Amino acid sequence: MTGQAEVLAALDAVRDPELDEPVTALGFVSSCTVSDGGTDVQVRLRLPTYFCAPNFAFLMVADAYDAVSAVHGVERTEVLLDDHFASDAINHGVAARAGFEVSFEGEAAGELDTLRRDFVRKAVLAGTDRVCRPLVAGGATPDRLAAMTLGDAPPTPDRERLRERRSELGLPAGDDAPLLVDLTTGGAVGVEALPLHLRRARLTNVNTEANSSVCRGMLQHRYDTRGQGEVEEVR
């Protein structure tokens, strides 16, 4: 029988598109209710502000609906976004499986797919910094970094997260793939281009971490309860 733990585990795969972190860890899941028989699930989501971008919000609600619906034994799924200026449109659109363009008239077709890919690209850059910065601190030279493969990097959660994000973009992600790849061509980043690539990766990661900290702080200020599955920020 499906329980809350299984549903929250499924929601761990749903990410804030901008922050590239699970909605559970961020505290965005305010409640998760499973019926006695395990067939009906209701999830309520919350966000740091009333005016969070509706396209971001729609992505998270729709992804949460898909994740919960895919849990074995679940027959009826309801995912609701609370306390947001576009809650009604988002909740109705997701429940009707209408899509963002139908729910928000006038938005460009395919906008969400483009937005998602843009943020995954940023996640790849941020992940590159998290994997490469310890290597640089340990004395790895530009020549060494340019010659390394993904499998040469230490087997850390950050490396596997980077591998997953690269796979989502169709970029080389096997152990024999270059550690540093061009996001457009998928080819290896050469020694000459490496400093600029690493600077871009570092800037992207710093911005992402700063945004994550701000969002967590705003959420805590807005709500005085912890979310289901929330993980305390590591500083």
Where are these regions (language model features)?
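Domain-level signature for proteins that mediate thiol-based redox and metal-cofactor handling
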Residues: 1-50, 55-235
